[in-house]
């Protein structure tokens, strides 16, 4: 069985997480990581152990996930610091979202019944895991951005939790964001979908200086930021908030209040009709900036956005919220190319650690590609994974064969052939 070796650049990146594993568990990290990145099909432990550089039984590899010594908070901190250090970040754009992974079997830890709104061919209920992910948005070029994950948590339904252990998605996310604030003192901006735009999350991060950019409910009941002037001698208690505003649908129909703005979203430069104003939202108990956008070519395409940072302009709000799409691309990569939803794990530790290692490998691969191919870093993840596979197989074949004229060229041809075969698979 071919036993591949890790490249020096990837070894240095992986070694940044050394403190998260014990002395006995650490050798299994590299032994599992490289086969994981090279495999194109089902990533079973039996298959990965055969390609690992560590000569241990398959049972030892299974025990690494279920019984090995991991320090998950330390691993999350190492991933976070690696991203901040590599890209020299002075301010953070954090994107938050959750994704569903279908599972079969009642004895798998953390599973539950969830409604999948994007399921094909039609929305419906699935049985599986619900993962909450935090990632840092990094600008790869003038138009492209990439989300690098550094934290992942499992949401468990209330009926599957012991008394006193249940936490909502918003509580889990708020606790993780408090850890981010403890690690980074600079400005932090959070991007999230409309499902996280409520006081249970915003109220938890308000005191630590994290602002939110999200989608606004179309039925949100907004009011004027400040109450109007009272007439002299008026009776009753002074109003705390302003008068109610019209419905958002009515505000969106007022054409005179919109102006044309050119924005850069989703790798394109487009012209939108934009309207912005400040309003008090009782659901958050604070004043927010509301941005309404309309497509001049498609009048029915209307979006309602908001931010808790009143200093942001309308263009910044629109372009920031467009960067939230990077985490959707991350979920696609994690499932289709890294096997997040095809894990053969059942116990509590194995389930959580498998997902954590999957996200860590994505971040390590992205950082490796940035260091080795900085000018082409905006390419899709599949291209970066192909580069890593080609270089790994080339170095492995060249190191295992005789030194002769043309041996490096032959090794490179074998590496490219392996990459083409795994890409097709």
Name each model feature, range by range.
Residues 1-28, 36-37, 140-156, 165-166, ...:
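A short, flexible helix-boundary coil/loop motif
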Residues 17-25, 36, 40-106, 110-113, ...:
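Electropositive nucleic-acid engagement tracts
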Residues 31-38, 298-325:
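Extended, non-catalytic structural segments that build the interaction scaffolds
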Residues 35, 64-147, 151-154, 261, ...:
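Active-site-proximal, Lys/Arg-enriched surface segment
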Residues 48, 91-104, 134, 189-197, ...:
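Short, conserved catalytic/metal-binding motifs centered on acidic residues
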Residues 58-63, 118-187, 282-304, 308, ...:
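Electropositive, glycine- and tryptophan-enriched low-complexity nucleic-acid-binding patches
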Residues 100, 313-345:
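Short amphipathic alpha-helical "interface-anchor" segments enriched in bulky aromatics
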Residues 159-233:
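Domain-level cores of phosphate- or acyl-group-handling catalytic modules
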């Amino acid at each position: 069985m071919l036993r591949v070796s890790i490249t020096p650049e990837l070894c240095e990146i992986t070694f940044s997480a050394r403190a998260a594993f014990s002395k006995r568990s650490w050798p299994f990290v590299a032994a599992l990581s490289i086969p994981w990145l090279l495999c194109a099909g089902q990533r079973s432990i039996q298959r990965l152990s055969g390609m690992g550089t560590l000569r241990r039984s398959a049972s030892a590899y299974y025990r690494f996930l279920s019984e090995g010594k991991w320090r998950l908070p330390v691993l999350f901190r190492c991933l976070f610091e690696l991203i901040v250090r590599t890209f020299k970040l002075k301010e953070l754009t954090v994107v938050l979202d959750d994704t569903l992974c279908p599972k079969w079997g009642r004895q798998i830890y953390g599973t539950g019944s969830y409604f999948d709104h994007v399921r094909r061919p039609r929305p419906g209920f699935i049985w599986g895991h619900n993962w909450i992910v935090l990632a840092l948005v990094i600008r790869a070029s003038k138009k492209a951005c990439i989300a690098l994950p550094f934290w992942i948590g499992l949401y468990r339904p209330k009926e599957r939790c012991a008394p006193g252990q249940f936490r909502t998605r918003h509580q889990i996310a708020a606790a993780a964001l408090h850890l981010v604030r403890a690690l980074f003192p600079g400005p932090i901006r959070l991007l999230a979908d409309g499902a996280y735009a409520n006081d249970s999350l915003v109220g938890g991060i308000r005191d630590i200086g994290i602002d939110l950019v999200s989608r606004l409910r179309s039925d949100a009941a907004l009011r004027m930021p400040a109450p109007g002037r009272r007439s002299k001698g008026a009776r009753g208690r002074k109003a705390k908030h302003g008068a109610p505003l019209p419905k958002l649908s009515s505000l969106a129909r007022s054409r005179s209040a919109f102006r044309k703005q050119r924005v850069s979203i989703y790798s394109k430069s487009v012209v939108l009709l934009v309207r912005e104003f400040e309003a008090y939202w009782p659901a958050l108990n604070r004043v927010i900036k509301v941005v309404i956008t309309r497509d001049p070519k498609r009048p029915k395409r209307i979006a309602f956005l908001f931010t808790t940072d009143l200093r942001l302009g309308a263009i910044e709000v629109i372009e920031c919220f467009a960067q939230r799409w990077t985490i959707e691309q991350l979920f696609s990569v994690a499932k289709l190319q890294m096997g997040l939803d095809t894990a053969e794990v059942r116990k509590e530790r194995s389930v959580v650690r498998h997902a954590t290692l999957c996200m860590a490998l994505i971040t390590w691969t992205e950082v490796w590609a940035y260091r080795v191919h900085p000018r082409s870093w905006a390419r899709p993840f599949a291209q970066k994974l192909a580069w890593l596979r080609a270089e790994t197989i080339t170095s492995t074949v060249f190191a295992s064969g005789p030194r002769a004229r043309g041996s490096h060229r032959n090794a490179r041809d074998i590496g490219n052939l392996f990459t083409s075969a795994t890409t097709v698979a």
